Amino acid sequence: DSLYITAGERGEGMIAQDPTKHPGSIIRIHLDGKIPRDNPKFQDKKNWLPEIFQIGVRNPQGMDLSPFDNKIYLTNHGAKGGDWFGEAKFAENYGWKILGWGGTNYTGSKIGPKWKPGFTKAIKYWVPSIAASSMVIYKGKEFKEWNGDALITSLKDQSLRKIKFKGNNFINEKIIFKGLIGRIRDIEIQESTGIIFLLTDQGSIWKLQK
């Protein structure tokens, strides 16, 4: 009964550390637009906007609710490197722009450490950047051996990747294909069959099945 919304930091960097502003945050509201009374502000984050669920993201791209553990997962663009896949976590901070997630500014100058205690740690980082875009937690019959894995598309890398993970622990990554159909913008799973559909920047829709 909740709606999760992501907001990029619009090139403003440290604004993602300001919980009184929306850029660089994850927002949680009810479907009727009301604010959940168990959001961070009503717990121990008194200075946060009441609708903010988490701060410190840069440019979120894909987001999905896992049908296996009922958690929210997302992909996020770093700068020059530092894309990541991770879990949206209540009242936590992914660290942008205190952390660089392994990447640098586009000028090549350093940003900050990849991660340090006190901040949310992503499940998987990519350096150099793959320009991670959409994602889903796969559930279906067509590729039942993938159930519970994250399927992540990319723009620059033009790939479809499968991430196996448990909790917040990365297990392995497999590139399903790369450079075959162009920049992949979106991914959807047909619920009744588990067949995968991919949308490219060229406006083409591709179907992936056995």
Where are these regions (language model features)?
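Blade-level signature of beta-propeller repeat domains, shared across WD40, Kelch, NHL, RCC1
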Residues: 186-210
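Beta-propeller domain segments
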Residues: 9-174, 182, 210
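Generic structural signal for coil-to-beta-strand starts
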Residues: 1-4, 70-71, 149, 194-195
